[in-house]
Amino acid sequence: GLACACALAAGGAWGAPERPKKDVEVVAVYYPHWHKYPKGTEWFGAKWDAGEWDFVKTARALFPGHKQPLRPYPGYLDGADPKDMETEIALAANAGIDVFLWDYYWYGGKVTQEESIEKAFLKARNRGRMKFALMWCYHERNNQFRPHLEPSRQALMTLDHTPEEFLGLIDHSIARYFNQPEYWRKDGKLFF
């Protein structure tokens, strides 16, 4: 996903020097499901073991000239592995990306699909090269990956937040993320 675009933009320069400060910050939305996670196995079965990469690997051409499946450079990185996250951070930072804006899911009063930020980003040795922020994905989690293009989409997780659950989201974010030195701020204010 993200690593592919960053590697191409960086020309494969993994060890490029730090970039000078600039007036404009470049933000990349980080979709956090490029790894195995419990809900994915629950939704799509035990064979679904590489996260969204399973969909990439099984992509089929839909028309002449549509080249599928494609293999990402530098490979199928595990979004929950700190070493793979270090690669993504290096690729992104070297390509001029300043901030990962994390898709952040909160359903039923608790955070879900947080493995990439908890197990990888916060444990990456080079995380100081990349700011991050949370973008609360306030939508139903639907099955976007249907084998046919019919319009119906099964709701995998529904929105039924109570005010107390929303406050739980804020409390969790304050306690776990907003105090991190890499958490992105604009004009001294937290971005959420």
Give the label of every model feature segment.
Residues 9-15:
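Boundary at the C-terminal end of the N-terminal hydrophobic targeting segment
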